[in-house]
Swiss-Prot record:
It comes from Oryctolagus cuniculus (Rabbit). SMART domains: LDLa, MACPF, TSP1. Ca(2+) binds at L138, N141, D143, D145, D151, E152. The keyword Repeat applies. This is Complement component C8 beta chain. InterPro entries: C8A_B_C6_EGF-like, EGF-like_dom, LDL_receptor-like_sf, LDLR_class-A_CS, LDrepeatLR_classA_rpt, MAC_perforin, MACPF, TSP1_rpt. The chain crosses the membrane at residues 252-259, 262-269, 379-386, 392-399. Residues 33-54 form a propeptide. Gene3D superfamilies: Laminin, Low-density Lipoprotein Receptor, Thrombospondin type-1 (TSP1) repeat. GO terms for cellular component: extracellular region; membrane attack complex. Heterotrimer of 3 chains: alpha (C8A), beta (C8B) and gamma (C8G); the alpha and gamma chains are disulfide bonded. Component of the membrane attack complex (MAC), composed of complement C5b, C6, C7, C8A, C8B, C8G and multiple copies of the pore-forming subunit C9.
Length: 590
């Protein structure tokens, strides 16, 4: 069961009221030649601090990384004078198993009499090192239009069009990056947002002069006059996980080989310490009688939109795409995705998100005759905030004595068994010192929240995105045989998706969350569990929640449709654990 409330005040007052209410709460802290490890050995990040014993399952046997045998060599590429072969990751290493300390691809020189026809016609100036084709009117204009300064070489005179210094849009470098949706990470640059095509009209934001890149259609600042805060109550961890956790870090439901039509929230990097801490501490209460109060505030700073066509690619990405073999070799295209991601951002919302989860002991609340409604009401009643926030007094029918009782419960939580079990914070946007102060200390003060909001203006995070597959950037304007390269990238993306999914990991114990990092799998353990498989714990008879297996391959097209399936057996639910959420099958038109 879920209950939601949403309200708006002029400043982050509503959220801070609850912060004030809880302000005294402390936050706890095969070939004989084998194909190189992509990651270091496993380091368990569990925060458990008490004495533990090994569970009945005990430590699982180490799983060694395993690659397939080598593919056949490709034909000799007539332009690169090289041939290629690769190996697939059959099984990631796990539980301190042997890593793959060897390469999963090989390239060697070769000779061929076939002609190279890789040149793309350029009617302008061909840049010396980057190979970019630019209009001759951009020569000697004071801008590095080529990316290698060759357009500014041997100039008798520089005809500079921009006579005033102008700033770059906030986060514009990140917006030019490719994106890996499996890990929620930004990779290498695929677009050149330092290319202006001679444009020099200033764009004023907050009395600052910005120069609009050629690739950008719009960059629209958002007014910070009002903030909306949403507060939602979840009666169980399964409800909380489905509605909050999966949206925070999981994109497993996307079929990444196709366009994703709508804008969606950009999750937190799955390898970040902040997310691992969040998962570990909330997962601890997956089978306790707890209620979850989740509060979330999103601050939007700017909306970004990319031009729909005729984009200037970053020269590093362009050169890599121009070098991939025309004969399909998964290893080369896989490396392209590893370095540059597999999608790029076409629209984005920039800003910051502050969210916290208050975990309450349901039985203790019932014994004391309190509800989460009481906590919310007290948070909005009779609290005076700092000078940066105007005083707000709201009477919601809760007695003063009851509010004081709630506050005393919170204040004394470390001295006796109280209602409040934990408070876990996630912050995105703002300078790093503000993120650290918010996420790893007590609840923020009004002044600190105001500082964070100011910092978000100049250091925004990407909080929502709309994306397209990377192969959509490959056009005949830049790449010879672009249709072949595009089809190869499309095919490689489907294979890449199957190779990097955490469903390939063996189950962790104690409801640990498996994550795949390169060629190994790690377990993020709930607080109270540790070990490479989360097998060391003092807790007994813990119900095990179900997790999905990997998707099957798509069926052949029949009646205009194709289907794929998965099973809830990795592991299956045990001892009263929750079943898998989401569909067991998917169907697409074909």
């Amino acid at each position: 069961m879920k209950k939601s409330w949403t309200w708006t005040w002029r400043v982050p007052a509503e959220l801070l009221l609850l912060c004030a209410a809880l302000g005294c709460l402390c936050v706890p802290g095969s070939r004989s030649e084998r194909p190189r490890s992509l990651e270091p050995t496993v380091v368990n990040r569990s925060l458990a601090k008490s004495r533990h014993s090994r569970s009945v399952d005990a430590t699982p046997m180490p799983i060694d990384c395993e690659l397939s045998s080598w593919s056949s060599w490709t034909m000799c590429d007539p332009c690169q004078k090289k041939r290629y072969r690769h190996a697939y990751l059959l099984r990631p290493s796990q539980f301190n198993g042997e890593p793959c300390n060897f390469s999963d691809k090989e390239v060697e020189d070769c000779a061929t009499s076939r002609p190279c026809r890789s040149q793309v016609r350029c009617e302008g100036f061909v840049c010396a090192q980057t190979g970019r084709c630019v209009n001759r009117r951009l020569l000697c204009n004071g801008d590095n239009d080529c990316g290698d300064q060759s357009d500014e070489a041997n100039c008798r005179k520089i005809y500079k069009k921009c006579h005033h210094e102008m700033e770059q849009y906030w986060a514009i470098g990140s917006l030019a990056s490719g994106i890996n949706l499996f890990t929620n990470s930004l990779e290498g640059p695929v677009l050149d947002h330092r290319y202006y095509a001679g444009g020099c009209n200033p764009h004023y934001i907050l009395d600052m002069r910005f120069r609009k890149p050629y690739n950008v259609e719009s960059y629209t600042p958002q007014t910070q006059g009002k903030y909306k805060f949403a507060l939602a109550e979840y009666e169980s961890y399964s409800d909380f996980e489905r509605n909050v956790m999966e949206k925070t870090y999981s994109k497993s439901t996307f079929n990444l080989g196709f366009k994703i039509p709508s804008i969606f929230e950009f999750g937190i990097n799955t390898e970040s310490d902040q997310l691992m801490n969040y998962i570990s501490r909330t997962k601890r209460f997956s089978h306790t009688k707890s209620k979850f109060l989740h509060a979330r505030s999103a601050l939007e700073v700017a909306h970004y939109k990319l031009k729909p066509r005729n984009l200037m690619l970053h020269y590093d990405f362009l050169q890599r795409v121009q070098r991939v073999p025309l004969e399909y070799s998964y290893g080369e295209y896989r490396d392209l995705f590893r370095d540059f991601g597999h999608h790029f951002i076409t629209e984005a919302v920039l800003g910051g998100i502050y969210e916290y989860t208050l975990i309450m002991n349901k039985e203790a609340m019932e014994r004391a005759d309190y509800s989460l409604n009481d906590v919310q009401a007290c948070a909005k009643n009779d609290f005076k905030l700092g000078a940066a926030i105007e005083e707000v007094y709201v009477s919601l029918g809760v007695s003063t004595s009851k509010c004081r009782g709630i506050l005393n419960e919170i204040k004394d939580r470390n001295k006796r068994d109280t209602m409040v079990q934990d408070l876990v914070v996630l912050v995105r946007g703002g300078a790093s010192e503000h993120i650290t102060a918010l996420a790893y200390s007590d609840l923020p003060t009004a002044d600190l929240m105001q500082e964070w909001g100011d910092a978000v203006q100049y250091n925004p995070a990407i909080i929502k995105i709309k994306v397209e597959p990377l192969y959509e950037l490959v056009t005949a304007t830049d790449v010879a045989y672009s249709s072949t390269v595009k089809q190869n990238m499309r095919q490689a993306l489907e294979e890449f998706q199957g190779e990097v999914s955490p469903c390939r990991c063996a189950p962790c114990q104690g409801n640990g969350v498996p994550v795949q990092k390169g060629s190994r799998c790690d377990c993020i353990c709930p607080v109270g569990f540790q070990g490479s498989a989360c097998e060391i714990t003092s807790r007994k008879n813990v119900p095990i929640d179900g997790r999905w297996s990997c998707w099957s391959r798509w069926s052949s097209c029949s009646g205009g449709q194709k289907t794929r399936r998965r099973q809830c057996n990795n592991p299956a639910p045990q001892d009263g654990g929750s079943p898998c959420s989401g569909p067991a099958s998917e169907t697409l038109a074909c």
